[in-house]
């Protein structure tokens, strides 16, 4: 099976260590609710660490290896998965540091007025005065709520960090790639 295009693969976490003796790996997910990672039937691993790839450099196609997922579960805030073909601790340890990617079309459907953070990236942020604040270039969590980073996408320069809460976010229109904010 071939990998989807690079634009369709979403990084969801990284392998932090081996789990047990039977080849399972422990993944440090980027999200506190890693539903897409837990439900995926296959994942792609990249052994190029993010710091070496550079922030503007996507995962290289040649560095990707696809694995079928035999099982996945939550354990102490991490995701533990068993990958087909990884059968012992030494094989699992060799994958330490690998980035975990999943095809975007493999994500479970979300309810109305719910969004995957990845779908917000690239949206234009507009305030109530209809002024463009910039483009959403990143989304993070601070423990209490999501935070969208708005700025210049070409330079990755952040101009605003805006809480993603209903008091601030007035509307999200993914079809038009816009987010209306009560923000100056």
UniProtKB/Swiss-Prot annotation:
Q: What is its main location?
A: cytoplasm
Q: What molecular function does GO assign, one term?
A: ribosome binding
Annotated compartments: Cytoplasm
Name the UniProt key words of this record, in alphabetical order: Chaperone, Cytoplasm, Ribosome biogenesis, rRNA processing
Q: What cystine linkages occur within this chain?
A: none
Gene Ontology BP term (one): rRNA processing
InterPro entries noted in UniProt: PRC_barrel-like_sf, PRC_RimM, RimM, RimM_N, RimM_N_sf, Transl_B-barrel_sf
Which is one Gene Ontology cellular component term of this protein?
ribosome
SUPFAM superfamilies per the record?
A: PRC-barrel domain, Translation proteins
Taking every annotated instance into account, which residue ranges of this chain make up the domain PRC barrel?
112-184
> Subunit comment for this entry?
Binds ribosomal protein uS19.
Family of the protein in this entry: Belongs to the RimM family.
Function noted in UniProt: An accessory protein needed during the final step in the assembly of 30S ribosomal subunit, possibly for assembly of the head region. Essential for efficient processing of 16S rRNA. May be needed both before and after RbfA during the maturation of 16S rRNA. It has affinity for free ribosomal 30S subunits but not for 70S ribosomes.
Q: HAMAP family given for it?
A: Ribosome_mat_RimM (MF_00014)
Recorded domain comment? The PRC barrel domain binds ribosomal protein uS19.
Name of the molecule in the record: Ribosome maturation factor RimM
- Species source reads Polynucleobacter necessarius subsp. necessarius (strain STIR1)
């Amino acid at each position: 099976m071939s990998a989807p295009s690079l634009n369709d693969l979403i990084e969801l976490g990284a392998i932090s260590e081996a789990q047990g003796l039977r080849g399972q790996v422990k993944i440090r997910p980027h999200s506190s609710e890693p539903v897409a990672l837990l439900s995926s039937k296959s994942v792609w691993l990249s052994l190029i660490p993010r710091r070496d790839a550079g922030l503007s450099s996507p995962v290289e196609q040649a560095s990707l290896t696809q694995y079928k997922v035999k099982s996945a579960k939550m354990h102490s805030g991490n995701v533990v998965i068993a990958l087909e073909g990884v059968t012992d601790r030494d094989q699992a340890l060799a994958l330490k540091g690998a980035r975990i990617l999943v095809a975007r079309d493999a994500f479970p459907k979300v309810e109305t007025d719910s969004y995957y953070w990845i779908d917000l990236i690239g949206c234009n942020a507009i305030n109530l005065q209809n002024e463009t604040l910039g483009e959403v270039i990143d989304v993070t969590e601070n423990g209490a709520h999501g935070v969208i980073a708005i700025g210049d996408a070409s330079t990755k320069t952040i101009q605003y960090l805006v809480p993603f809460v209903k008091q601030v976010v007035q509307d999200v229109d993914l079809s038009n790639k816009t987010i209306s904010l009560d923000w100056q």
